[in-house]
């Protein structure tokens, strides 16, 4: 379970304070698929960065499972990210110098598992994502849809409990976007919790719930919590 309580985030530059999140509270149950929507600048990406332990809130609490994680030390935050959270980005964020196989294997290198086990996990997820034939290709040799498949494979290869997806179909045409959403839905049906930021109303309807932000506050929640 993921739970945030009265989460606030502000940024100060010289004498100007910008409030990105203002007393945001919600719970995401295990196995739930939640979409977060709102206009540009409403705090969606800031919220996702905090959920992914890439940033700290100014105040408020964040529980991941039974642990309060908002104010962990950096090493502890890194350990949680490596073991429990998978990230999928709009711009894919693949490493240009690594081929498909190496990109997918990267998060496994931080875990205490053998090379043989790493290879087996990579082969299995490439087969599932239908990209085995691209194993030795580099990102620039792939289409946008193929790059996002690689990014999803990298995000899930170590079996995270939570996937955070930031506009996962934003750079894709409708066909490839639909395929990516199908993959995320399959993962969710298997029990993976997903929180997805999106501007796409069609993508949001696939989620169990949609949380709408405006000026850093929740203004509406649609759908039913699991």
Segments (PLM) and residue ranges:
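ABC family nucleotide-binding domain
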Residues: 2-210
């Amino acid at each position: 379970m993921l739970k945030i309580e009265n989460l606030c985030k502000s940024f100060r530059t010289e004498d100007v304070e910008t409030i990105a999140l203002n007393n945001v509270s919600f719970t995401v149950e295990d196995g739930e698929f939640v979409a977060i929507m709102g206009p540009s600048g409403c705090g969606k990406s800031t919220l996702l960065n905090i959920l992914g332990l890439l940033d700290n809130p100014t105040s408020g609490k964040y529980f991941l499972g039974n642990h309060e994680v908002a104010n962990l030390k950096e090493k502890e935050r890194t350990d949680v990210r490596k073991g429990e959270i998978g990230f999928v980005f709009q711009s894919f964020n693949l490493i240009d110098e690594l081929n498909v196989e190496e990109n997918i294997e990267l998060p496994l290198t931080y875990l205490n598992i053998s090379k043989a086990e790493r290879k087996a996990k990579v082969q299995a997820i490439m087969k599932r994502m239908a990209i085995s034939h691209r194993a030795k290709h580099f990102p620039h040799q792939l289409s946008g849809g193929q790059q996002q498949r690689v990014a999803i494979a990298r995000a899930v290869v170590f079996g995270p409990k939570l996937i955070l997806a930031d506009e996962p179909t934003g750079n894709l045409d409708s066909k490839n976007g639909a395929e990516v959403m199908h993959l995320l839905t399959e993962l969710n049906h298997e029990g993976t919790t997903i929180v997805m930021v999106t501007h796409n109303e069609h993508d949001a309807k696939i989620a169990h719930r949609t949380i709408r932000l405006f000026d850093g506050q929740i203004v509406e929640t649609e759908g039913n919590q699991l």
